[in-house]
C-alpha cells in the first residue's frame, strides 16, 4: 500500500529494485551524468565557466537558462568534458572511474609489475597487444589526475598512454595534453 514504508526486515537506506530501475532509465545509455547542482554556471548565471563546452569536440554540450544539457545523439563519449569540469558536475558513467581503476589493477597484475598501460579505443581496436595487459578507454582525454594518483597510491610507478593517431581520430583535438 502507498505510504506503507519499507517492507519488514528491509533496510530503508538501501535502494530497492524500483529505485535502481529509475536510475538506469535516467541514464539510458548516456556516457556522462550531469549533476547540475554542482555546476558553477548553473549556480551562478554570471559565471563565465564553459570548460566543458570548450572540451567537447562534438558540440554536444549547452549551458544556459540555469541548466546543462548534453545532446546524447551528438555526444561521442570521449569523456573530455568530465575531466575538465572543475566542480565534477559532469560525471563519467561509461566507463566509470571505479571500473577504470579496477581494470587498471587487473592489467597491472597481468603485466607482473608496477606498470599500467592505457590505450585509446581506436588503438585497442587494432588488437595489436594482449587485451588483458592494458585498459581501453574511449579517448585518452578521459584520463584524469585522480585516476593516476590512485594508481600511484597502489604502487604503480609507470603509466603508458598509447594513442591511435589523434590527428585523424573522430575525437580530434579533445585535449592538448594528449597530443603534447
Sequence positions of predicted segments:
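Structural motif
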Residues: 73, 118-123, 137-139, 163-165
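Hydrophobic beta-strand segments of well-ordered beta-sheets in folded domains
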Residues: 31, 113-117, 132-133, 156-164
Amino acid at each position: 500500500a502507498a505510504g506503507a514504508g519499507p517492507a519488514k526486515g528491509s533496510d530503508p537506506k538501501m535502494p530497492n529494485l524500483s529505485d535502481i530501475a529509475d536510475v538506469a532509465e535516467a541514464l539510458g545509455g548516456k556516457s556522462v551524468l550531469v549533476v547540475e547542482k554542482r555546476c558553477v554556471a548553473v549556480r551562478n548565471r554570471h559565471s563565465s565557466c564553459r570548460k566543458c563546452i570548450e572540451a567537447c569536440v562534438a558540440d554536444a554540450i549547452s549551458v544556459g537558462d540555469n541548466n546543462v544539457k548534453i545532446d546524447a545523439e551528438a555526444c561521442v563519449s570521449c569523456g573530455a568534458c568530465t575531466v575538465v569540469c572543475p566542480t565534477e558536475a559532469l560525471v563519467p558513467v561509461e566507463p566509470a572511474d571505479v571500473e577504470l581503476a579496477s581494470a587498471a589493477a587487473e592489467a597491472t597484475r597481468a603485466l607482473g609489475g608496477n606498470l599500467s598501460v592505457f590505450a585509446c579505443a581506436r588503438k585497442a581496436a587494432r588488437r595489436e597487444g594482449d587485451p588483458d595487459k592494458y585498459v581501453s578507454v574511449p579517448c585518452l582525454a578521459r584520463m584524469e589526475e585522480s585516476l593516476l594518483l590512485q594508481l600511484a597510491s597502489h604502487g604503480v610507478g609507470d603509466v603508458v598512454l598509447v594513442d591511435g593517431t589523434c590527428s585523424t581520430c573522430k575525437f580530434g583535438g579533445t585535449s592538448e595534453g594528449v597530443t603534447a
